[in-house]
């Protein structure tokens, strides 16, 4: 219109109105409704799971019924600036200790790993958490949250879990005072449970629980400021259930811990003659 009205060239007309010349040749791309809905899904996913990247977004999209491949999700994820901020890498310690494969379970309820984790409420008071996972299924069996937890508290958690799942064959933990206490030793002896103590200063020997701890802190503890012990217990228990039900693991063929455990038990049920 400007060219015809004022008799100027295409270059002059575009420069005057600040419009790229390419817009005169290529029609604007119409975004299909399906792609727009997919982008909305990815944006909502990134807000709900701020520490999960495009790979997990692609897996979740397919679990929710989207017919998409990784390449497309990656393109849209980066196009809309949904990248997860890179974490600073810590220097890894090296040492000699028990190889993690020396005791790798081949079925559920063989080996439970235990460890403590700490945080605070907004008033600065300590939150102490006892995390328990099944190393085979990767299920988080418990995250027990208190201000303090002693050996008797550990025994109470083990009693509760054994009542639901039965006692394990082994417990793996470090040499913390709560774990080496006589109360825990008595519980293990009474329930015929063996103990595996990792070497002092060797957290990599308890690799699965350390991996869980890292994800737990990255995906929840670093994002929340708890107002009270009660609030912490409610939110952390919700996270534990969500982790078991909705977090796929590559080692399990992208099944969640609960799905993997259910699948294993179904496939290994005694056959009725």
Please annotate each region the language model reported:
Residues 1-273:
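Charged DNA-binding/catalytic regions of mobile-element recombinases
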């Amino acid at each position: 219109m400007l060219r015809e009205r004022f008799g100027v060239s295409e270059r002059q007309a575009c420069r005057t109105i600040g419009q790229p010349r390419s817009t005169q040749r290529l029609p604007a791309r119409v975004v299909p409704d399906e792609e727009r809905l997919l982008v909305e899904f990815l944006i909502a996913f990134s807000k709900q799971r701020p520490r999960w990247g495009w790979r997990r977004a692609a897996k979740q999209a397919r679990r929710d019924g989207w017919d998409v491949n990784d390449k497309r999700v990656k393109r849209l994820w980066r196009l809309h600036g949904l990248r997860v901020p890179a974490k600073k890498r810590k220097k890894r310690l090296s040492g000699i200790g028990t190889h993690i494969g020396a005791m790798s379970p081949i079925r559920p309820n063989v080996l439970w790993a235990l460890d403590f984790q700490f945080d605070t409420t907004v008033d600065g008071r300590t939150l102490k958490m006892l995390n328990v996972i099944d190393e085979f299924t990767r299920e988080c069996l418990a995250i027990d949250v208190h201000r303090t937890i002693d050996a008797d508290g550990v025994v109470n958690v083990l009693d509760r879990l054994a009542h639901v799942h039965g006692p394990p064959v082994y417990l793996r933990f470090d040499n913390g005072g709560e774990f080496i206490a006589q109360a825990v030793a008595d519980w293990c002896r009474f329930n015929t449970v063996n103990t595996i103590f990792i070497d002092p200063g060797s957290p990599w020997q308890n690799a699965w629980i350390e991996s869980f701890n890292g994800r737990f802190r990255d995906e929840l503890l670093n994002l929340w400021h708890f107002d009270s012990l009660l609030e912490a217990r409610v939110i952390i228990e919700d996270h534990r259930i969500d982790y078991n039900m909705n977090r796929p693991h590559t080692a399990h063929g992208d099944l969640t811990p609960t799905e993997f455990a259910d699948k294993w038990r179904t496939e290994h049920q005694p056959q009725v003659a």
